[in-house]
């Protein structure tokens, strides 16, 4: 019984992943997002990431593997996840939860920076407000979303969307894989002397 359930869950996850990667229209925005981030880093700019719930954890995961390490040793890249509990509780209490991300973007965002905004529905009000603040700051915006992209669908420079209408966890499972691929692509473009990346170049994957 348990084994059957485990197998079913893995099969369903694999099916949704296969559906996503079978259409180049889903994959090309990942490439676009990586190039946009590389351009920002090379220009001395930073990325600010944000999300709610599981997407909040993904936003933190994205930032820590940029500032810290993914697979290879290399210089850290400037990334901040909006995850300071004191900031979130202060702004949530004094201004309302809808402002917890936008207030941070207003405070530290600069022209040319990138906002990496995650929402499985595309309708999170606090994420939309963060995007609006980023636009006012003349920042670039990448969204990582699901379903049909929601209300934020037309607010981004790059929209990466997992077009799945079911449970949010299935969307998030693909989101974390996209995040890892983004970091790999960034490393390829930022660190061309890395031996493993040189191998990828020789194999025609870069």
Curated annotation (Swiss-Prot):
It is found in: Cytoplasm. It is an enzyme of class 5 (isomerase). One of its GO terms (molecular function) is carbohydrate derivative binding. GO terms for cellular component: cytoplasm. Substrate binds at residues 52-54, 65, 93-94, 119-121, 124, 172. InterPro entries: GmhA/DiaA (IPR035461), Phosphoheptose_Isoase (IPR004515), SIS_dom (IPR001347), SIS_dom_sf (IPR046348), SIS_GmhA/DiaA_subfam (IPR050099). Pathway: Carbohydrate biosynthesis; D-glycero-D-manno-heptose 7-phosphate biosynthesis; D-glycero-alpha-D-manno-heptose 7-phosphate and D-glycero-beta-D-manno-heptose 7-phosphate from sedoheptulose 7-phosphate: step 1/1. Residues 37-195 form the SIS domain. Keywords: Carbohydrate metabolism, Cytoplasm, Isomerase, Metal-binding, Zinc. Its cofactor is Zn(2+). Its EC number is 5.3.1.28. Coiled coil: none annotated. It catalyses: 2 D-sedoheptulose 7-phosphate = D-glycero-alpha-D-manno-heptose 7-phosphate + D-glycero-beta-D-manno-heptose 7-phosphate. SUPFAM superfamilies: SIS domain. Binds 1 zinc ion per subunit. GO terms for biological process: carbohydrate metabolic process; D-glycero-D-manno-heptose 7-phosphate biosynthetic process. Zn(2+) binds at residues 61, 65, 172, 180. It comes from the Bacteria. Catalyzes the isomerization of sedoheptulose 7-phosphate in D-glycero-D-manno-heptose 7-phosphate. Belongs to the SIS family. GmhA subfamily. The reaction produces a racemic mixture of D-glycero-alpha-D-manno-heptose 7-phosphate and D-glycero-beta-D-manno-heptose 7-phosphate. Homotetramer. This is Phosphoheptose isomerase.
